[in-house]
């Protein structure tokens, strides 16, 4: 498939999961371009101007000696810059507050998995939900991750 990765399978995984589409050129990123995007977004921010460290990491990733978080490789760029939640594979939260629900929704919309606990010591902290609920309230949902999570928070807040 290409000359950058040792097997066609690795090339397929890179192209189908991690390579961004470059609209101007009508193609997907090559493996070195994906690595460079990750280095410029994640590594450069943490190593300041230490180009020796950046180059060592770049070479190690390109040669598959080390592998960074593939979620960070996939999301490096505007999405990761906006909110680093998308860089994580999974997260956890106890369901002990009504805000747990919209927080879980936001995290899931960022592409991160959410593990949760509904053990008695947690859910006993939640307020009781009324059996019947009537409301004329209209909730306007902004079509974004933040907007949907906020709307869920508003719906749940109406219950208490």
State the predicted function of each range.
Residues 1-160:
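Extended catalytic cores of very large enzyme megasubunits
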């Amino acid at each position: 498939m290409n000359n950058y990765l040792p097997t066609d399978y690795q090339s397929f995984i890179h192209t189908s999961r991690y390579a961004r589409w470059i609209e101007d050129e009508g193609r997907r990123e090559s493996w070195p371009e994906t690595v460079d995007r990750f280095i410029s977004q994640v590594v450069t921010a943490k190593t300041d101007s230490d180009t020796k460290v950046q180059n060592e990491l770049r070479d190690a990733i390109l040669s598959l000696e080390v592998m960074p978080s593939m979620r960070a490789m996939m999301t490096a760029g505007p999405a990761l810059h906006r909110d680093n939640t998308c860089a994580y594979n999974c997260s956890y939260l106890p369901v002990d507050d009504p805000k747990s629900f919209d927080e879980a929704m936001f995290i899931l919309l960022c592409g991160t998995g959410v593990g949760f606990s509904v053990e008695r010591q947690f859910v006993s902290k939640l307020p009781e939900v009324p059996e019947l609920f009537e409301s004329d309230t209209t909730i306007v949902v902004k079509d974004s991750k933040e907007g949907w999570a906020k709307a869920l928070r508003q719906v749940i807040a109406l219950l208490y």
